[in-house]
Amino acid sequence: MPKRTQEELAVLQELILSNLTNVRMIILYGSYARGKYVIWDETYDERGVTTYYQSDLDILVICDTRDANKAERHAREVIVPKYDTRMEGKRHPAPPNIIVETPVTINSCLLYTS
């Protein structure tokens, strides 16, 4: 994983821990976790249309909260803007994707998928 991305993740970890309460776990998932991330891809189709793609940072936060939706909104409205400010000029073009769930929800999902 690129050093710059590691720095971004460290900033996100710090912001998550200082802005959400009762955080149990912070999990990186998606293409960066699998090591199959795309730094930058530019594709041209037969009509001459150009598309661009770059992997984003997918983060699952597990915390003890009564309202995971409210915590997730807080992440979008408070943590992501603070991240943008801290990483100005050095961050991914796409904002990080932060999902917040409770341990009960995660455990229920694991029971149903196993």
Please place each PLM-identified region on the residue numbering.
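Metal-dependent nucleotidyltransferase catalytic core
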Residues: 1-20, 46-107
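Short gly/ser-rich loop at a beta-strand->alpha-helix junction or flexible surface loop bordering the NTP-binding
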Residues: 23-44
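Acidic pyrophosphate-coordinating catalytic loop
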Residues: 37, 107-109
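Conserved small/polar residues in nucleotide/adenosyl-binding loops
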Residues: 112-113
